[in-house]
Structures are given as C-alpha cells and as structure tokens.
Amino acid sequence: MPNPSHSPLSLNGAEKLRVAYLLSRYPAVSHTFFLKEVLGLRERGLDVHVASINSPDRARKDLPDIEAAEADHTYYVKSLGAAKTAVQLLAIAFQNPGVALRGLAAALHLGGWDIKARAYALFYLAEALLVGQWMRRQSLNHLHVHFGGPVATVGMITAQAWNIPWSVTLHGPDEFFDQEAFYLRQKIESASFVVCISDFCRSQVLRVAPNLIDSRLEVIRLGVDCASLQPAAQFQDPDSVATKQLV
C-alpha cells in the first residue's frame, strides 16, 4: 500500500483514514512482507487493523513475539465455527437488508451461469458480510487487500455490499494466467487504486485495463531491509547455497 504521505487515498472532510487490511493468512512464514508492511505503515502514522481469512500457519507458541502480538489483535473471519457464523450472518442480513441484497447481487453477478462458481461466490459473500461488519464495528473506512485471488474477491464484494472504498496489491502470476476465473478486470476497475509489486506486474495490469489512469496505479516493490541483517564473516572456501524462496 502506498506511503500515506503520497497516497491516492482521500476522504471527505476531516474524517481520519482508518484502514482494514484483509489478508489470506496472517501471520505466515511465507508472507513476512505482510507483517513488515503493516508495521511500517503504522510507524508512519497510519491506523491499520488486520483481518485474516485463515488462522496463522503455526500454533501461537511457535510464533515469534511480534507475530504473536499481531495474531492477538487480528480478526479471523473463520474463527467462530459454522453454527455461530450462520447466526451472525442472519443477524447481519436482518439488521442490514440493503447490505445483504447488494452483496448477493454482486456475488451472483460474479458467478454467472456456472453453478460451482456461484456456490463459491456465496461463500465469498458470507465472508464479505463478516468483514464489513467487523470494519463497521472498528470504524474502519478503507479496505486494502493483498493478492488478486479469492481474498480479493471477498474484498471486492465487501466493498460493493457495504459501500466501502477498497484497493488491492497485485502480485501475480496466477491472476494473470486466468483473468476471467479471478474476475481480474472487475477488481481492477472497481478498486480505488491498484498497487503492483513490479514493473512487469504493472504492464500486465495495463493489458487487462488499458484505460486505467496513472493516479490509480502504483508500483511498490517487495524488498529486504538490509539494515536488519548482519553480514557473515568471510570464509576462504565459502559454500554456495541455492534457495527456492526467500522469506
């Protein structure tokens, strides 16, 4: 997400920007950039709260202190169980019929005539209603999502159902391979702005939405804070190590 000092985000009047981050899994070993981004934005003065579709990838006792602290303050969408979730969804629909109807229309529009896709869309709708209610209770007024897959589908339905502005960080490559299955054009066009992790990612976004204006598109690369690393002592016969993924 852009640095708030030069972000395309804007709110009417003097309303304070309070951001919800919707992530697929938080914390997670392979998603350390989520943690660094959230902490970095908070250090810059942005009020950021996190919701995660799934629970952490490790037990709490196995989490580093900073990740355990984040987990304690993260809203986990699937944490209630089926029965309690069903009751909560019925309450949301009863108390906010307009929200439920807008969300249902958005979900069914995405599913088209594919029965399986519609079924998945209804699951995404359920999660979107829960996320929107959490945002309302926390007085959060902007939703940001990482990854362009199912979690972004939940984010888009949340925005449409609850009338909340939203944005997305796209990584690729999956969503670029099957744009229709990921509803990529709809996500790009409905988002307030789109963040790309590389110039190549940006070029793919512009292929999908060539009329997207520059003010709604930013490149923010994922990197490593070299200041946090200690160089190893030099060896006369160093070993070479090939890594598949850096986390």
Task: List the model feature ranges, each with a label.
Residues 19-20, 141-175, 195:
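Active-site proximal beta-strand in glycosyltransferases
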Residues 75-79, 95, 119-120, 131-149:
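Short N-terminal targeting/anchoring amphipathic segment
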Residues 116, 166-192:
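A conserved, positively charged/aromatic
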Residues 200, 223:
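Carbohydrate-associated surface elements
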